[in-house]
């Protein structure tokens, strides 16, 4: 469009010059040379404009790729805590047990004893198990005779009906209670420890100076791997919170130093 405008404009100038200069025309070569220069200038202008647009487009693409890469890194950090389960056969579950802590058990039978290396004094189980561990109980009673007491009283038990939990991202997920693996489905059990009561003694935790401190027994949680699903899909191993201990929480009384 601009080239056509240049040609028309030059033709107009040539007509004016022919009238004003006693009908003398410009040399044909100089006119052609001027037209060629104008055309080249217009082509160069369009080329530079296109190059600028290409640079802007490439810059926008680079910025978008960087932003997408950052988002992917964030998603991968979250997904790194999630191990999907493709098949629910027994062999795969046996391989995936490395994701479990001792507090998580996959079994076709209800567990009757605490996990290995866990104390039995606070285990809430059957009388048969308690009779089997009478020697350990006598040892615990012997400790109490020496004046050793727990600040808080706790109890531990296998939770057999856990249906939901909070994962490491703060999302609520569904805990798989029963997993079908061929002819023998297995269930998922959680060994949890919690406080028996908030105040084992009148003023709070046992053995705390109540003149200067407020105290209360509180159940503490930690993360374990468990088979879960989110929104009825994405079945896999996730970190979830369960009750694992009982601690004494202290706060200084106002006006006390």
Curated annotation (Swiss-Prot):
GO terms for cellular component: extracellular region. Keywords: Cleavage on pair of basic residues, Disulfide bond, Glycoprotein, Growth factor, Secreted, Signal. One of its GO terms (molecular function) is growth factor activity. Residues 1-18 form the signal peptide. Disulfide bonds join 152-217, 195-246, 205-248. In the embryo, the expression peak at E4.5 and decreases at later stages of development. The keyword Signal applies. It comes from the Eukaryota. Pfam families: NGF (PF00243), NTF3_N (PF19338). It is found in: Secreted. Its main location: secreted. Glycans are attached at residue 131. Residues 19-138 form a propeptide. Seems to promote the survival of visceral and proprioceptive sensory neurons. Belongs to the NGF-beta family. This is Neurotrophin-3. It comes from Gallus gallus (Chicken). The lineage of its organism: Eukaryota, Metazoa, Chordata, Craniata, Vertebrata. The gene is NTF3.
């Amino acid at each position: 469009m601009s080239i056509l405008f240049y040609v028309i404009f030059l033709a107009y100038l040539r007509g004016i010059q022919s009238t004003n200069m006693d009908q003398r025309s410009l040399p044909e070569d100089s006119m052609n040379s001027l037209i060629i220069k104008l055309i080249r200038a217009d082509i160069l202008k369009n080329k530079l404009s296109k190059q600028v647009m290409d640079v802007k487009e490439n810059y926008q693409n680079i910025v978008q790729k960087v932003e997408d890469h950052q988002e992917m890194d964030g998603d991968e950090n979250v997904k790194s805590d999630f191990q999907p389960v493709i098949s629910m056969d027994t062999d795969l579950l046996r391989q995936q047990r490395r994701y479990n802590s001792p507090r998580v058990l996959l079994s076709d039978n209800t567990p009757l004893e605490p996990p290995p290396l866990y104390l039995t004094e606070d285990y809430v189980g059957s009388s048969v198990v308690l009779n089997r561990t009478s020697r350990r109980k006598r040892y615990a009673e012997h400790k109490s005779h020496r004046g050793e007491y727990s600040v808080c009283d706790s109890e531990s038990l296998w939770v057999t009906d856990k249906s939901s939990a909070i994962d490491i991202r703060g999302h609520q997920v569904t805990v798989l209670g029963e997993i079908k693996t061929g002819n023998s489905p297995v269930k998922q059990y959680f060994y949890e420890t919690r406080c028996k009561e908030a105040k084992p003694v009148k003023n709070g935790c046992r053995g705390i100076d109540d003149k200067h401190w407020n105290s209360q027994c509180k159940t503490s949680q930690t993360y374990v791997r468990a088979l879960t699903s989110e929104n009825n899909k994405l079945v896999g191993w996730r970190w979830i919170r369960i009750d694992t201990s009982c601690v004494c929480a202290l706060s200084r009384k106002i006006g006390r130093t």
